[in-house]
């Protein structure tokens, strides 16, 4: 979508972890995981405007984060060395995905920047080269570059497409920010879940999140949100939190529950997607 001042708008959808298991700790300090990643239509909008002077400018960093530390800025900087010319860009972020929520908003913004600038700057990187680049920014970035619902392993960079039934999701965000680093270093965190032999949507059920019990213990507000949403369906935490979600087969059912919980919490009604909106552009 073109707007008056030459910026162009690009979507950056959120994700849910429908299943998340920690299968081991790596020597580099990261953890190996297995997870089902699902795209949803809750999304940020990334506005980009090309420059020909090599400058990268992020106009509205999120939450006081320095420009150089923002994932979108870092994504552009990382890709710039592959550009054919003196390429630059201006970036604006219209945030709709809540931060610190386990929905991958910052990672999705960064992935959108990589996908678009790879074309604009004529970098010529393949999807898997971009995925490798994205892994240096964060464990969720590769999935958004992959652009389809997936079973992820490794630290999240090994991806296999997965068919997920069409569902609607009610998402609630408790008034707390969960520290991912704190959860991953927690002594009682499950780190030895068995690896899946035949990972399919059906075979992995019942779904679980190995971080959930630790987060509930350390952040009672997340437990309260889980308890509330569990009154209406099978609730689960996404990522390392803080958001809790429940899946429904029909939009009307999801909407009715959304109306119930939106008076108590910051809440969202989202539709599952089969692929990244940029793949349709």
From Swiss-Prot:
Question: Which residues does the record give as ATP binding sites?
Answer: 98-108
Q: Which reaction does it catalyse?
A: 4-CDP-2-C-methyl-D-erythritol + ATP = 4-CDP-2-C-methyl-D-erythritol 2-phosphate + ADP + H(+)
Q: Which GO terms describe its biological process?
A: isopentenyl diphosphate biosynthetic process, methylerythritol 4-phosphate pathway; terpenoid biosynthetic process
- Write out the pathway annotation from the protein's UniProt entry: Isoprenoid biosynthesis; isopentenyl diphosphate biosynthesis via DXP pathway; isopentenyl diphosphate from 1-deoxy-D-xylulose 5-phosphate: step 3/6
Keywords associated with the record:
ATP-binding, Isoprene biosynthesis, Kinase, Nucleotide-binding, Transferase
- Say if the entry is tagged with keyword Hydrolase: no
What's the EC number here? 2.7.1.148
Which InterPro entries is this protein grouped with?
GHMP_kinase_C_dom (IPR013750), GHMP_kinase_C_sf (IPR036554), GHMP_kinase_N_dom (IPR006204), IspE (IPR004424), Ribosomal_Su5_D2-typ_SF (IPR020568), Ribsml_uS5_D2-typ_fold_subgr (IPR014721)
Q: Which GO terms describe its molecular function?
A: 4-(cytidine 5'-diphospho)-2-C-methyl-D-erythritol kinase activity; ATP binding
Active-site residues? 15, 140
Functional note:
Catalyzes the phosphorylation of the position 2 hydroxy group of 4-diphosphocytidyl-2C-methyl-D-erythritol.
Which family is this protein grouped under?
Answer: Belongs to the GHMP kinase family. IspE subfamily.
Recorded hits in HAMAP family, A to Z, give: IspE
Q: What is this protein called?
A: 4-diphosphocytidyl-2-C-methyl-D-erythritol kinase
Q: Which organism is it from?
A: Neisseria gonorrhoeae (strain NCCP11945)
Q: Which gene encodes it?
A: ispE
